[in-house]
């Protein structure tokens, strides 16, 4: 298969994932029409965005896996991918420690606000990065990148699980 055909196949897969996510969100919007959607439009919009990201993230695993299969013969790609995945997983660990760290003396600082926004975004996307690392680890052609990708998967999963348990524990009634 030619390189252009491979790129076209992967691009078509991502377009299909986008179309599927858009269709699911459209069906969800149609199913939840009513006064609540009108009155609480911003909250419904945020929920629709999260639904889109979730469906697209899951559907995009297929073209992502296909692209990785096409890139299997290139060891330098796998070296860079696995090291980058480890670095990115380390940012999840850093975010976790910033989340559980004690509050600063000035609670309304701009740095804390930006850190909270970045931490929330990082937490929401963490399962998708973990799943992507797992798919890459399964497809990896050699042992070294596979192990690095599995470590990145474990870091992403453990950080997301810890944050989720922290949220559940804090919401629990006394």
Give residue spans per PLM region.
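Alpha-helical transmembrane segments of polytopic membrane proteins
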Residues: 10, 44-60, 112-130, 152-155
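Transmembrane alpha-helical segments of multi-pass membrane proteins
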Residues: 10-14, 78-97, 150-161
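Alpha-helical transmembrane segments of multi-pass membrane proteins
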Residues: 14-32
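Perimembrane loop-to-helix junctions flanking transmembrane segments
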Residues: 30-47
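Canonical alpha-helical transmembrane segments
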Residues: 54-77, 130-138
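Membrane-proximal helix-loop-helix units in multi-pass membrane proteins
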Residues: 77-81, 88-134
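Membrane-helix boundary connector in multi-pass membrane proteins
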Residues: 112-113, 130-152
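Juxtamembrane boundary at the C-terminal end of a transmembrane helix
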Residues: 161-174
């Amino acid at each position: 298969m030619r390189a252009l055909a491979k790129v076209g196949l992967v691009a078509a897969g991502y377009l299909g994932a986008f179309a599927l996510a858009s269709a699911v969100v459209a069906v969800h919007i149609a199913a939840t029409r009513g006064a609540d959607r009108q009155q609480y439009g911003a909250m419904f919009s945020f929920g629709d965005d999260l639904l889109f990201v979730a469906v697209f993230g899951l559907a995009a695993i297929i073209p992502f896996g296909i692209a990785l299969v096409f890139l299997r013969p290139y060891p330098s790609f796998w070296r860079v991918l696995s090291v980058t995945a480890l670095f990115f997983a380390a940012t999840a660990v850093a975010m976790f420690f910033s989340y559980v760290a004690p509050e600063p003396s000035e609670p309304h600082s701009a740095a804390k606000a930006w850190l909270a926004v970045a931490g929330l975004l990082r937490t929401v996307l963490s399962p998708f990065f973990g799943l992507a690392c797992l798919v890459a680890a399964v497809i990896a052609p050699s042992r070294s990148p596979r192990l690095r990708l599995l470590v990145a998967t474990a870091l992403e999963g453990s950080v997301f699980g810890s944050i989720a348990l922290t949220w559940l524990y804090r919401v629990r009634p006394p």
